[in-house]
């Protein structure tokens, strides 16, 4: 593919093409076992997976090209169904088992590609789904955050943080201030807005 929306040739000028956004998903991080284990975990059968010993792939390419192509294409053809099935399984578990609201579940576009990241994201979504006001929970979580002291805006963020935790001691005070932020009133707390 091209990086800067242009294809460059040695003797010809560059020309622009349509821009397509591609996202690459590496399914390797979604299973501690191999590709077949991941397929089995979402009930997708890999018929040709046992037909060829992976360590003998170069030999099979030369001696049994039809089998090699069939083996390789089966893997490629199963990638998208396995990915979609895995995402649907996670979404079902998040909603039916953990109790995360439907609108807050992961999607095909934002699913982390490692099990550890997926667990972390799911825990975060569960925490945010426990309260009636997600913005209040977000405020509480930001209070627990660690500031990057090397950030060029560190002093400003620290000022916003200190202001917010000193001024809003009760949930009702915080909710009132957040309502003013949403209404774009002139009385809104600009430091709280920056903190959030």
UniProtKB/Swiss-Prot annotation:
Keywords: Mitochondrion. GO terms for cellular component: mitochondrion. It is found in: Mitochondrion. Its main location: mitochondrion. It comes from the Eukaryota. This is Uncharacterized mitochondrial protein ymf30. The lineage of its organism: Eukaryota, Viridiplantae, Streptophyta, Embryophyta, Marchantiophyta.
